[in-house]
Amino acid sequence: MVRIIPMAASSIRPSLACFSDSPRFPISLLSRNLSRTLHVPQSQLFGLTSHKLLRRSVNCLGVAESGKAAQATTQDDLLTWVKNDKRRMLHVVYRVGDMDRTIKFYTECLGMKLLRKRDIPEEKYTNAFLGYGPEDSHFVIELTYNYGVDKYDIGAGFGHFGIAVDDVAKTVELVKAKGGKVSREPGPVKGGKTVIAFIEDPDGYKFELLERGPTPEPLCQVMLRVGDLDRAIKFYEKAFGMELLRTRDNPEYKYTIAMMGYGPEDKFPVLELTYNYGVTEYDKGNAYAQIAIGTDDVYKTAEAIKLFGGKITREPGPLPGISTKITACLDPDGWKSVFVDNIDFLKELE
């Protein structure tokens, strides 16, 4: 950006930025000559008449303003594109210590279906996809088992997953019967009427059970803790194109939540951001991995993420071997997300 030096009221002073690229006017030489010949008019020092100096300064101002306008246009264009992009939360990825045990718990206690499973022996890991409907239209779970690793640190930053069920009490009884852990018995949420309960899976991941009627997305929430809620909301609105659905402050318990997503909570999965008063950083552990989101253009997505404060950890482009285009990033709190090309994602499922 061109730097504009303010003009003095008593004289016309050209910006040194206008001359700094010219070998004829190195700044050190100008300073030395100025000190030796202060009695010479400035217009003669630079070999320019006053009206030419004025025109040069005005041109510099014009360049700066044009640059600002172009930047503003780029921001506006990207904001509009992000808002119009066809985005959907595809799956949430995390690591488990015993794949078979976890699949058994999710299918028998939580009513999920095993959608597909793949083993990658050359890279020593296995993936399993579970959920309440096909991957091309539902938010699902992607479990990762790394050979020989049976335990992970969940950390303090990850909160819980949310699952909508018809009858919370009945689900809790089933969890107990299967040897699962219940960390909060069924009952109304504090300050509200919705019946909830909290359970833990065999690896210690927490699940909030929410009593709701029939919903197209039973796997309905991912809760993450953030150190600056306003910053996080702005980032997810601008860079991810999410909508702020609602906020709720709980001064009695010293925390605030914000629900972000691509549609209403009762029909779409949401990201629940939680801010605990006075806590600005969290240990994220090594268990929770990321959320995957569909996009029509991973390249433009990466541009928007960079522009609005995110960090790209994998530049946009195809994955080796399968040609699926992705880009990966960190939000301002360090939570990872991966954007996947919509068409490529559907091809993977064929």
UniProtKB/Swiss-Prot annotation:
Q: EC number(s) for this protein?
A: 4.4.1.5
Reaction(s) catalysed by this chain, per the record, are: (R)-S-lactoylglutathione = methylglyoxal + glutathione
GO CC terms, sorted: chloroplast; chloroplast stroma; mitochondrion; stromule; thylakoid; thylakoid lumen
Covalent S-S links between cysteines: none
CDD domains from the entry?
Answer: GlxI_Ni (cd16358)
Show where the VOC domain sits.
Answer: 88-212, 218-342
What's the domain of life for this entry? Eukaryota
The pathway to which it is assigned is: Secondary metabolite metabolism; methylglyoxal degradation; (R)-lactate from methylglyoxal: step 1/2
Note how many cofactor molecules are bound and how. Answer: Binds 1 zinc ion per subunit.
**Signal sequence interval, chain numbering:** none
Which PROSITE patterns does this UniProt record tie to the protein? GLYOXALASE_I_1, VOC
The keyword Glycosyltransferase appears for this protein: no
Q: Answer whether the UniProt record assigns the keyword DNA-binding to this protein.
A: no
Outline what the protein does: Catalyzes the conversion of hemimercaptal, formed from methylglyoxal and glutathione, to S-lactoylglutathione.
What's the protein name?
Answer: Probable lactoylglutathione lyase, chloroplastic
Q: Which organism is it from?
A: Arabidopsis thaliana
The beginning of the lineage is:
Eukaryota, Viridiplantae, Streptophyta, Embryophyta, Tracheophyta
